[in-house]
Amino acid sequence: MGKYFSKDKSKYMLYTVSHPMDGYYWIRHADRGSVPLAILMVILFAVSFSANRLLASFVVNDIDPRAVDSLYELMGVLAFYLILCVSNWSVTCLMNGEGRMKDIAIAVGYGTVPITVMMTVSTIISQVIADDEQAFYGLLLGAGIVYGLIMILIGIMQVHNYTLGKTLLTLFITFIALLLSLIHISEPTRH
């Protein structure tokens, strides 16, 4: 357990957030990442997502807190994470990707860190902003989401040793595979 959540692994995750190109390269080539730590980051993302929906001020949040089921959202985020990783691995196996399943899981998991941080900060800030300051909330949340998506893009690109164009094509096909998987899972079985 200590080797997965060691101080070095945690520091390297933060290094990857601040230096994504170099960080993701060494995750693939020197086995520096940690899958359990990446899964923990996805769980923390799910918690911050639910907390934002439950606790953000009424100024920025029009969701009825009684309608939020945090456990259901946690399971949904974890299922989406699993299906995304499997879909990407399946597509990249056919497109000569060099990444392993664990590398993909780490790349996506570490990519959620900036989103989690900014979502938590936005939730806290939402408690003290006025109606005409909603743009600051949106800016913080948007910056975290954009940086997180850029990190995931860079992570997939580095893990599979792809060009930007091939990475974008692969991610497009991955999302088609993900949608097909979700449709198949949600469709009732016919006898």
What are these regions (language model features)?
Residues F5-K102:
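Selected alpha-helical membrane-embedding segments in polytopic membrane proteins
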Residues M1-D8, E187:
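Low-complexity, intrinsically disordered extramembrane tails and loops of integral membrane proteins
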Residues F49-R53, M119, L182:
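Structural signal for membrane-spanning alpha-helices in multi-pass inner-membrane proteins
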Residues R66-S90, I106-A177:
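Selective recognition of hydrophobic, aromatic-rich stretches within alpha-helical transmembrane segments
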Residues L180-H191:
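Residue-level detector of conserved catalytic or cofactor/ligand-binding positions
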Residues F45-A46, I176-L178:
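A short structural micro-motif
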